[in-house]
Amino acid sequence: MASSSGIGVMFRREQAPQQLPDYARRVEAAGFDELWVVEDCFYTGGIAQAATALAATQRVTVGLGIAPAVARNAAFLAMELATLARMHPGRVHGGIGHGVAEWMDQIGARPESWLGALEETTTAVRRLLRGERLTV
């Protein structure tokens, strides 16, 4: 995963995904260091957007803000982030959050503890990205 302290911009969730490649190229040409894509339920997928932005650019770091911990399987999330990081070394920021409670309710993903679910998923993803094996 990337490490950056630069200035970034966000691709708003309301924007049509077809606009992302051109937007990403313009962000990079303008000298920004980071482009953040949003994963919100019922809009567009964050992994697909991150892959699109990375493929359309050469230098800019792309951040995923955020993959909801209770809606994403940790093994699959780690696999997707690892694939992006291998294809675009040093240019990927993976973001994991608890998600919007109302939206998580709508998809039947309400945990007993929001922070507990976030910690469990984040820990599992980190360990998997380090190459560790996990038992569930």
Predicted regions and their residues:
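Active-site oxyanion-binding pockets that recognize sulfate/phosphate
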Residues: 17, 67, 108-111
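Short, glycine/charged-enriched secondary-structure capping and boundary segments
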Residues: 22-24, 49-52, 76-79, 107-111
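N-terminal beta1-alpha1-beta2 module of alpha/beta enzyme domains
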Residues: 1-65
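Active-site-proximal loop/turn and secondary-structure-junction residues that shape catalytic pockets
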Residues: 13-15, 41, 68-70, 98-100, ...
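Internal, glycine-rich beta/alpha segment that forms the wall or movable "lid"
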Residues: 3-5, 78-136
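Conserved N-terminal glycine/acidic-rich loop preference
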Residues: 32, 70-73, 103-105, 114
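Structural motif corresponding to the early beta-alpha repeats
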Residues: 64-76
